[in-house]
């Protein structure tokens, strides 16, 4: 329902501005408490977002936009994917695409690192997977900032003692910051046994995404306790987007050892 409301609102924005043909994209901010939607940006042109949408769906937005601008209609153009349906058919996909922004605040020391609706990223990474965990972890690695997935991060003020109140306050303080690596602190909070409900109350993240991160952390814990000789577990880890390097870190062994075990069990990348 929320998606349909956005779709209809996007068309209304295009008509109001006067975009009759070509590529365009509209971006919204959504209040998670009441569903209120606000238009924060509209690009009446083929943009970087259009390029990512093309990669994600296989629909050649720039090419179609150019042909429309010279007088063709969508019904006259062939769908490049199916080869027999017109381009007016909206693309449907059976996989998950994740886009994550790339921030380099370390290069811009005078810039406020607090995130808002103002664009502060210098680029983004996109990944495709058969499920969210796989797509998400692949996207994190694609940022090329040294992550193997939901890597552990240190939390200032947290100690390994049983000072529960002090540790809770330290975790809560980091979660309250709207910062680029907030997702890693959320994962760390889950590792420290903070509930999804508590994290949602602090961050306002949708519980679905928090539950997906919870599943990744649960798999981490299962991997730490079990042997990699268990083929079903290793296969589950790979299907959930864990790289050989990430598994090696969990088991405190070399990446080469993980790769050898994986190949021994005939677990190899496949393409649909």
Predicted regions located by residue number:
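ATP-dependent carboxylate activation and anion-phosphoryl transfer catalytic cores
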Residues: 1-233, 240-241, 265, 269
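C-terminal amphipathic alpha-helical interaction region
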Residues: 233, 245-272
């Amino acid at each position: 329902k929320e998606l349909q409301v956005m779709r209809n609102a996007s068309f209304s924005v295009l008509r109001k501005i006067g975009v009759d043909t070509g590529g365009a994209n509209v971006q919204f901010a959504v209040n998670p408490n009441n569903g209120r939607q606000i238009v924060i940006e509209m690009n009446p042109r083929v943009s970087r977002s259009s390029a990512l949408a093309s990669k994600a769906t296989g629909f050649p937005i720039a090419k179609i936009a150019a042909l429309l601008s010279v007088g063709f209609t969508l019904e006259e153009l062939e769908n490049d994917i199916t080869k027999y349906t017109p381009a007016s058919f909206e693309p449907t996909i059976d996989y998950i695409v994740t886009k994550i922004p790339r921030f380099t605040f370390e290069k811009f020391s005078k810039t406020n690192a607090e995130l808002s609706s103002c664009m502060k990223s210098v680029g983004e990474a996109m990944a495709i997977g058969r499920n969210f965990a796989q797509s998400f972890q692949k996207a994190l690695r694609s940022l090329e900032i040294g992550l193997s997935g939901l890597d552990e991060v240190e939390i200032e003020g947290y100690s390994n003692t049983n000072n529960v109140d002090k540790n809770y306050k330290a975790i809560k303080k980091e979660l309250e910051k709207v910062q680029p690596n907030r997702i890693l602190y959320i994962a760390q909070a889950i590792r420290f046994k903070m509930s999804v409900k508590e994290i949602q109350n602090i961050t306002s993240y949708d519980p679905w995404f928090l539950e997906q991160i919870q599943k990744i952390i649960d798999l981490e814990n299962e991997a730490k306790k079990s042997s990699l000789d268990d083929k079903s577990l290793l296969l589950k880890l790979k299907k959930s987007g864990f790289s050989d390097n990430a598994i090696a870190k969990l088991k405190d062994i070399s990446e080469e050892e993980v790769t050898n075990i994986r190949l021994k069990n005939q677990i190899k990348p496949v393409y649909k």
